[in-house]
């Protein structure tokens, strides 16, 4: 028997995605940071590791409100899988940039790994991507 129901994890992931979109559009990352436990770990391959929701919030706010990250407008998910037995979500997330009006969508893929903690929040996130693709 699984520790969590797939639907519970999926709802948490949906909420996480909505909070990320809101953060990108408003530059307020409060709701996104609230998707994590107080003692969560965030491993971002380019920037390093962050421990605790407050540190994650401080980092994401500073990073996403500064160019070039401030030009990210959305994070559409192209695919994901959920392991409800262990609480893992693995997804390909596109880092979509501002529309330049030339008919092309500028975006680069990111692999996001989330570990569910229960109660609608995650205790771990890891993002893997090549930052040179965004230059």
Describe the residue ranges of each PLM region.
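Short, mixed charged/polar active-site loops
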Residues: 49-50, 105-107
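Short, low-complexity N-terminal intrinsically disordered segments enriched in polar/charged residues
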Residues: 1-34, 38
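A solvent-exposed, acidic/Ser-Thr-rich amphipathic alpha-helical stretch
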Residues: 7, 29-89
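Short beta-strand edge/turn micro-motifs at domain boundaries
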Residues: 107-135
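Generic short beta-strand segments
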Residues: 92-98
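A short, polar/proline- and glycine-enriched secondary-structure boundary/capping micro-motif
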Residues: 54, 101-104, 133-135
């Amino acid at each position: 028997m699984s520790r969590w129901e797939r639907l519970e994890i999926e709802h948490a992931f949906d909420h996480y995605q909505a909070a990320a979109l809101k953060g990108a559009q408003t530059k307020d990352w409060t709701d996104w940071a609230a998707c994590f436990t107080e003692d969560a770990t965030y491993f971002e391959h380019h920037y390093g590791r962050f421990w605790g929701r407050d540190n994650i919030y401080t980092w994401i706010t500073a990073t996403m409100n500064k160019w070039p990250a401030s030009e990210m407008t959305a994070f559409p998910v192209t695919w994901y899988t959920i392991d409800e037995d262990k609480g893992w979500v693995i997804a390909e997330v596109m880092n979509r940039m501002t529309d330049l009006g030339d008919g092309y969508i500028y975006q680069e893929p990111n692999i996001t790994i989330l570990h569910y903690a229960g109660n609608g929040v995650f205790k771990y996130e890891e993002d893997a991507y090549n930052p040179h693709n965004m230059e």
